[in-house]
A protein has these predicted regions:
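Polybasic "coupling" helices that flank or enter modular domains
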Residues: 158-159, 174-241
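Phosphate-/nucleic-acid-contacting segments
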Residues: 217-301
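Cyclic-nucleotide recognition modules
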Residues: 131-189, 193, 197
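Cyclic nucleotide-binding regulatory module and flanking cytosolic helices
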Residues: 40-93, 138, 143-144
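Cyclic nucleotide-binding regulatory domains
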Residues: 96-158
Length: 301
């Protein structure tokens, strides 16, 4: 699949399943990715009992719904309703850590408009991103594979909201089989593909191509074309020197593809950004679509 073919699909969100990637020529039938008004997820009473100094418990009304996370949206109504009372909204701040490497996982997070990086760290302090999680997935996949912890570190790379649930509650639902197990296992396979492709990309492709891939994957998990991100954080995620990111971002800005200023990146020309990216972006997105499109979720409704 050619890199430019990644533009064939448009990402939106639908309450009933993973129907977010549709041919661009059908765009007018599905609304805009910037328009969230056609979603029908259920609002939650934002009362949270747990929190930390950086991931604060959130009190009062908020504009987010469970259906804005696509894994939750793919669940049948009875499962959705059963889990809803235990899903609590939390504000995830930029740079906050959801779990450290080897730490016992107490919660599972379903991002809504936040993005979380899964990082692998070396003894010398160097780190690299192995996967990125947004409103297409969840943080805490190791719990479903029988582990209580993972070697990766989960760090918020873009602030926003998520819904979280106690690990024991969701694992118990998973062990009962049915729709949740199907959705989680399909997502796990897609996440493995992303991790593998990221490793290949970081080994063989130029920094500019990696940056384009990373920006596109981040945008796909956001409701806007603007990212709040420092070049230092991007460099850490890609496992490259900051100077390399500065040079690559400068070329993209000079070409009119992005605008970067004071930690904010605005994508101005996504089609051209897709053309500059390597094939890794399209490979990962195609696999997510193949595994998690509405056609494959036979139990979703």
């Amino acid at each position: 699949m050619e890199a430019q073919d990644a533009g064939l699909y448009y990402r939106g969100i639908d309450r009933i399943g993973w129907t977010d990637l549709v041919p661009r020529h059908e765009l007018r039938k599905h609304g805009s990715s910037q328009d969230w008004s056609y979603m029908e997820g259920k609002s939650m009473d934002a009362s949270v009992h747990y929190g930390s100094s950086k991931n604060e418990k959130f009190h009062g009304p908020h504009p987010h719904t469970l259906g804005q996370n696509r894994l939750l949206a793919a669940l049948p109504e009875e499962v959705y309703e059963r889990l809803a009372p235990d899903l609590e909204p939390v504000r995830l701040e930029l740079g906050s850590v959801l779990h450290e490497s080897g730490e016992h996982l107490r919660y599972i997070y379903f991002p809504v408009d936040s993005i979380v990086s899964l990082l692998c760290e070396l003894d010398d302090g160097a780190s690299g991103e192995i996967a990125v999680v947004g409103n297409e997935g969840l943080v805490g996949i190791a719990l479903f594979m029988g582990g209580k912890s993972t070697l990766s570190r989960a760090v918020v790379q873009s602030a926003g909201f998520a819904f979280r649930i106690r690990a024991d509650i969701l694992v118990r639902e998973f062990e009962n089989g049915g729709a949740l197990r199907e959705v989680v296992l399909l997502y796990t396979q897609a996440l493995i593909t992303q991790t593998a492709q990221t490793a290949v990309c970081n080994r063989f492709h130029a920094v500019e191509q990696q940056l384009c891939r990373w920006l596109l994957m981040s945008l796909d998990r956001m409701p806007s074309n603007e990212l709040t991100m420092t070049q230092e954080l991007i460099a850490n995620n890609l496992g490259v020197r900051r100077e390399g990111v500065t040079e690559a971002a400068g070329k993209l800005q000079a070409a009119g593809l992005i605008h970067y200023c004071r930690g904010k990146i605005i994508v101005l020309d996504r089609p051209k950004l897709e053309q500059r990216a390597c094939e890794c972006y399209a490979v990962v997105e195609k696999e997510f679509y193949r595994l998690l499109s509405k056609r494959t979720l036979s139990t979703a409704r």
